[in-house]
Amino acid sequence: MVQALRLTSFSHGAGCACKLGPRELTRVLDLLGPATKPEDVLVSEETGDDAAVYRLTDGTGLVLTLDFFTPLVDDPGDWGRIAAANALSDVYAMGGSPRLALNVAGWPVDELALELLAEVLAGARQIVLEAGAAVVGGHTITTEREPLFGMVAIGFVETDAIVRNSTARPGMHLYLSKPIGTGLITTAIKRGQTDEDVARLAVDTMTSLNADASAAMVSARVGAGTDVTGFGLLGHLRKMLEASACAAIVNAGSVPLLPTVLDLARRDIVAGGTKRNHAWLQEVTEWGELTPPEQIVLADAQTSGGLLVASDQSPSTDLFTEIGEVVPGPPGSITVIGRVRE
């Protein structure tokens, strides 16, 4: 492997933490205004959902999404694998199955060897193949210093089984299929302040596909779903609740966390994107007795996070068992994190 320099030293932010903040994004979309769409557009940007869905036939929809970001780890293959899993996750979050992917890359050819880019692409292809899909092309530009990589992900979904973020209802339980904390850990990686075992666990979490959780979600006919990425757990929950005209209570002690993340938050090893999320959440969140570091963890900008699912099925059902098994961590990790209310 050709790697003379740390990839994270070329990035201003880590992974999905470099996303435009939710408040800023809302402002831009408000300035843009609504647009007329064909009637076959079943899901678009209007509810801030994870992907668009276009009806192909009476029973089949095309799922389309795009994600890209700066390096969040130093190994180029891992970066490619994480970016691919992150892009495919939006298809899974809609209840779909990925079929095709396109590479989107920006590369500082005067700063980083092309062999590194090849490793990024190879890592991404590995994950796409694992998902049963294929990489069929892409587009690459040159950049001055900061590398960028991501993918367009395309899949199919049964139109009567689309999982939206706008259909949560009071009384539904909230499930989470992965632990949180990847934003804090990748920020620590960038700053050289985390150990190898914790970094490896975070990478393993981010490269784990949401395929099994998605299949369980679809089989259970859940009420609503989304994936947890750059706006953090509570940020994506806020988007779901606003789209569904609901509220929720979250048991913070039941949220599964990756190791060391609360300590990292206490030491202020926190990405700017997470701080923007936290500020945005102040408008609507009653934190109770949670300390500022505990609040930061719940706002932490995730990359390739888990599925956040609202379902009226109780924790004793197969949905809990099947999604619970997807969560990395010790046996018995608690994945029911709260409940939707009016």
Please give the residue ranges for each predicted region.
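N-terminal glycine-rich phosphate/pyrophosphate-binding loops that anchor nucleotide-derived ligands
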Residues: M1-A93, A133, R169-L174, F320-T321, ...
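Glycine-/charge-enriched secondary-structure boundary and capping motifs
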Residues: V2-G13, E24-R27, P34, E39, ...
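Glycine-rich anion-binding loops of enzyme active sites
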Residues: L56-V73, D78-R81, S97-T194, E325, ...
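Small-aliphatic-rich amphipathic alpha-helix that forms the alpha element of a beta-alpha
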Residues: P76-L102, E119-E130, L209-R221, L233-K239
